[in-house]
């Protein structure tokens, strides 16, 4: 039976700072990608509004055999261009970029581990929420878009796309969380306490 814990007299080797620095590099790269995504979403929303402003549903559908279906299709495109996804998605991406700056600095300096990890977890939370929001908003429109297409054989595609989209986002966010858990574990404060091996217990 183990009845004691020894305190090592040898020097305690601290965790490698490159675990935190590696996290800093990763979040820094994702932060730059978030900035590009914010710009693309903002420009995409402006381009969609400009395109829809030049479209006349009555003129486009005038020669179509089924005018009502054509107008429904144009209306679904108009709904896509007016979705808050463009503005809110761009705002989320910009927030991720701004949040990545202090997170990257704290992780790279590796001076305040607890604060750096709190910022990192906050960044992961915002990233997960934004990705699920964007995916949800897009799939909501996607379902409406397919409802406007009278092709019953392809109606299953909306459920299949939803499964893949939500599943992909979930796997991505779980991977980010798992990586941060690993960094937290590898950078935990060292200790001099040593538990004696069970294989060397003296039963006398």
Where are the model-predicted features located?
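Topology signature of small-to-medium multi-pass alpha-helical membrane proteins
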Residues: 2-204
């Amino acid at each position: 039976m183990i009845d004691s814990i020894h305190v090592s007299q040898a020097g305690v080797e601290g965790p490698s700072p490159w675990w935190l620095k590696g996290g800093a590099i990763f979040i820094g790269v994702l932060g730059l990608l978030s900035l590009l995504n914010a710009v693309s979403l903002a420009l995409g929303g402006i381009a969609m509004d400009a395109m829809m402003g030049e479209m006349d549903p009555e003129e486009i559908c005038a020669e179509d055999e089924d005018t009502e279906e054509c107008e429904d299709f144009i209306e679904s495109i108009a709904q896509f261009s007016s979705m808050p996804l463009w503005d809110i998605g761009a705002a989320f991406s910009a927030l991720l970029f701004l949040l990545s700056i202090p997170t990257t600095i704290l992780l790279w300096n590796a001076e305040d581990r607890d604060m750096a990890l709190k910022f990192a977890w906050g960044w992961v939370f915002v990233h997960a929420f934004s990705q699920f929001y964007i995916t949800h908003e897009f799939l909501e429109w996607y379902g409406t878009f397919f409802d406007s297409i009278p092709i019953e054989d392809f109606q299953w595609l909306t459920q299949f796309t939803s499964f893949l989209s939500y599943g992909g986002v979930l796997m991505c966010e779980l991977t980010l969380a798992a990586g941060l858990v690993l960094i937290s574990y590898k950078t935990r404060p060292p200790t001099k306490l040593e538990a004696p091996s069970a294989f060397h217990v003296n039963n006398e």
